[in-house]
A protein has these predicted regions:
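Histidine-dependent nucleotide/RNA phosphoesterase domain, centered on the 2H-phosphoesterase fold
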Residues: 1-167
Length: 167
C-alpha cells in the first residue's frame, strides 16, 4: 500500500479549497477534500509490517518540534502535465527531519530537491488551469502517516499515525 508523511489543512482551508472553480475537462479528475493533503515525504509502496517503525521514527524526529506556519500559494501550477498543484511553503525543515528519520526504513531512491504541493487535480491538466489563484495560510500542529487505500471507484486516505507538534 502507498504511504506518505503529510499534513492536512484545517477546516477553514478545506472550505476555501471547496470554493475554487472546478470546470469539467476530459481526462481531468478533481481531487476531493479527503485528498487535500500536503505530502512532506511520499514513501511509495510500504509493507504494513514497517508502518509502526516509520511512525516511531517520525515521532522521534519531531519530538520537541513546535507548530509550523505553512503558506499554500500564490497560484496553481501544472506539475509534469499530470497534476495541478499549489506549492506549499514553510515545510522545508519538517521535510528534512522526516526524510532523515525515515531514510533508513524506506530508502530515498530518487533524490530530488524538497518540494511540497497541495494537489487539486490529476490527469490531463490543461495549460489554462495554471495560474488559478489560491493563497492560504495555516499553522500545522500535527503530522500524519497516511495510507492510500484508494481504488478506481473512490479515493480513500486513512491516517495510520498522528504525530502532534507541541514544541
Amino acid at each position: 500500500m502507498r504511504l506518505a508523511v503529510a499534513v492536512r489543512p484545517p477546516r477553514s482551508v478545506v472550505d476555501r479549497l471547496a470554493e475554487l472553480p472546478r470546470p469539467p475537462r476530459p481526462g481531468l479528475n478533481w481531487s476531493v477534500p479527503e485528498q487535500w493533503i500536503v505530502k512532506v515525504r511520499p514513501l511509495g509502496h510500504v509493507a504494513e509490517a514497517l508502518w509502526p517503525g516509520l511512525a516511531d521514527a517520525v515521532r522521534a524526529a519531531l519530538d520537541g518540534a513546535g507548530p509550523v506556519g505553512v503558506r499554500v500559494g500564490p497560484v496553481a501550477e501544472r506539475l509534469g502535465g499530470q497534476w495541478l498543484g499549489v506549492p506549499a511553503h514553510g515545510l522545508d525543515d519538517l521535510g528534512a527531519a522526516v526524510f532523515e528519520a525515515t531514510a533508513g526504513i524506506v530508502p530515498v531512491t530518487h533524490p530530488q530537491p524538497f518540494r511540497a504541493d497541495l494537489v487539486l487535480a490529476r490527469g490531463r491538466v490543461p495549460a489554462d488551469l495554471a495560474g488559478l489563484p489560491l493563497d492560504v495560510r495555516w499553522t500545522v500542529d500535527e503530522v500524519v502517516l497516511v495510507a492510500d487505500r484508494s481504488s478506481p471507484r473512490a479515493p480513500r486516505l486513512a491516517d495510520v499515525a498522528v504525530v502532534p507538534l507541541r514544541g
